[in-house]
Amino acid sequence: GFYISCYETTQLVWEAVMGSNPSFFPGANQPVESVSWNMVQTFINKLNNTYHTNYRLPTEAEWEFATRGGNKSKGYRYSGSDVVDDVAWFSNDELEHPQPVGGKTPNELGLYDMSGNIFEWVNDWYGKYSSKPQVNPKGPDKGSDHVLRGGSWKHSSNGMRVSFRTSIPTTRLNKCGFRLAKSASIASAVQSINNSVKILSIAYYTLDGILANNPSSHHIYVKVIRKEDGSVTRNMVVY
């Protein structure tokens, strides 16, 4: 199993980790864009090393399972609806740039912008689908292009379909970003360990170390958990 972010990774999160913002269209709660696949890997490595997490890009199979609504799927053409305007920012909206994340209706799993807004990098190299049934395929071992899913603000409704896929080399485009995933086995193991020791306190701090008594939505904090065995864990979270 796996976990996947409800939102596309925002410029706020990217800048908090990397210290700079590569996006062509600035906006804290807009998805980070103009990032290549390789740049995303650098971000994920720094995020994991800094905050002791295990994030990664979703595989293409995981991404499609999620965009279709997972085990709650109702078989929609787009992610969460048969009416594209309900769930996707796309070319008919006559937009000049991507929109802040979470502005449309989520899909059956509560995931936003799986159709439209920006294309999303997945982990896989691009390759033709196998003609044989497969369970959680991982794509080719090597290639020249990586897969993009989801469509973008520049594309027609055809690109918003849950089955639509394309690919490009690892280059930067202002219509391409990503969302984070995490393997459930790792997350479950951590949760199991955490539950075996009594938690004494949970506090949120801003990135410059100031205690946040009333955390605000869509802001980044360091979550500090202190337990009775004296251990302290710190993780970056978007509240």
Where are the model-predicted features located?
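Functional-site microenvironments in short loops/helix caps that host divalent-cation chemistry
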Residues: 23-26, 31-162, 169
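Short, small/polar residue-rich loop motifs at catalytic or cofactor-binding pockets
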Residues: 104-107, 197-200, 217-219
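A short glycine-rich, aromatic-capped structural motif
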Residues: 1-22, 115-116
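Residue-level detector of functionally pivotal "anchor" positions at catalytic/ligand-binding pockets or at interdomain
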Residues: 182-212
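Hydrophobic alpha-helical segments, especially N-terminal targeting/anchoring helices
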Residues: 112-115, 205, 226
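C-terminal tail/sorting-segment detector
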Residues: 175, 222-239
